[in-house]
Amino acid sequence: MVVAPYLAVAIGGSLGAMSRYLVTIMAQNAWGIKFPYGTLLVNTLGSFLAGFFLIVLVGRFSAEESFRLFLFTGFLGAFTTFSSFAAESLFMFEQGYWFKLMTNILVNNVGSLSMVFIGTLVAKYVLLGHQGSN
């Protein structure tokens, strides 16, 4: 059994989970707990990073498989959280917080999809430079 891929995922996952916890705590301290801003922030930021690094590391530099496992499966997999989003949405549904529920669902989904796209655009801009602006 090859240990390197499992170790890459484990280390990335540990760092991603700790980062998610820190970002969530910072978001709660900044904006309070009336809305799951921490979950929204990690999901949208993680989506941006996934799009960015998909272009930079996979498309441009052909990163090693163990590094891709570390970053995408490990770090970003643990940093972003669909399960917290689902649980928080269920809580809002059960409490009858309809506006918060719909906002949470819409902003997490549209925001995350938009951010992965924006991440790819930013990566392409960074890699290609601003050639057209001369």
UniProtKB/Swiss-Prot annotation:
Stated membrane topology is: Multi-pass membrane protein
Q: GO annotations under biological process?
A: cellular detoxification of fluoride
Q: Where in the cell is it found?
A: Cell inner membrane
Q: Which InterPro entries match?
A: FluC
Keywords of the record: Cell inner membrane, Cell membrane, Ion channel, Ion transport, Membrane, Metal-binding, Sodium, Transmembrane, Transmembrane helix, Transport
What GO molecular function annotations does the UniProt record carry, in alphabetical order? fluoride channel activity; metal ion binding
Gene Ontology CC terms, in alphabetical order: plasma membrane
Q: Please give the catalytic activity noted in the UniProt record.
A: fluoride(in) = fluoride(out)
Q: Which family does it belong to?
A: Belongs to the fluoride channel Fluc/FEX (TC 1.A.43) family.
HAMAP family assigned: FluC
Protein name as it appears in the record:
Fluoride-specific ion channel FluC
Q: Which gene encodes it?
A: fluC
